[in-house]
UniProtKB/Swiss-Prot annotation:
PANTHER family: 50S RIBOSOMAL PROTEIN L21 (PTHR21349), LARGE RIBOSOMAL SUBUNIT PROTEIN BL21M (PTHR21349:SF0). Keywords: Ribonucleoprotein, Ribosomal protein, RNA-binding, rRNA-binding. This protein binds to 23S rRNA in the presence of protein L20. It holds the Pfam family Ribosomal_L21p. Part of the 50S ribosomal subunit. Contacts protein L20. InterPro entries: bL21-like, bL21-like_sf, Ribosomal_bL21, Ribosomal_bL21_CS. It comes from Corynebacterium diphtheriae (strain ATCC 700971 / NCTC 13129 / Biotype gravis). HAMAP family: Ribosomal_bL21. The keyword Zinc does not apply. This is Large ribosomal subunit protein bL21. GO terms for molecular function: rRNA binding; structural constituent of ribosome. The keyword Magnesium does not apply.
Length: 101
């Protein structure tokens, strides 16, 4: 059984026992969170109706908070000597899917 959930502006296909890296979610490692909205559930049959999806819940446990890879940004203007370097590391949360009910 799997579900498609939306969190942090992205959609993830999750099944029970999966580890997923998502955009930062507030909470301590070891705490439980409910992932909403649920867009699709596939068990014995595929469910996409909003009334049926309202009865389904996806729960996950926060494993750890990590940072993504460094993204390098360089601005450059020709003939003027203007260069600007910048970097960024996105904050991520690792979740373990504990149940789809």
């Amino acid at each position: 059984m799997y579900a498609i959930v939306k969190t942090g502006g992205k959609q993830y296909k999750v099944a029970e026992g999966d580890f997923v890296k998502v955009e930062k979610i507030e909470g301590e490692p070891g705490s439980s969170v409910a992932l909403t909205p649920i867009l699709l559930v596939d068990g014995a049959d595929v469910t996409t109706k909003a009334a049926d999806l309202a009865k389904v819940s996806v729960t996950a446990e926060i494993v750890e908070a990590v940072k993504g890879p460094k993204i390098k940004i360089l601005k450059y203007k020709n003939k003027t000597g203007y260069k600007k370097r910048q970097g960024h590391r996105q904050q991520l949360t690792v979740l373990k899917i504990t149940g789809i009910k």
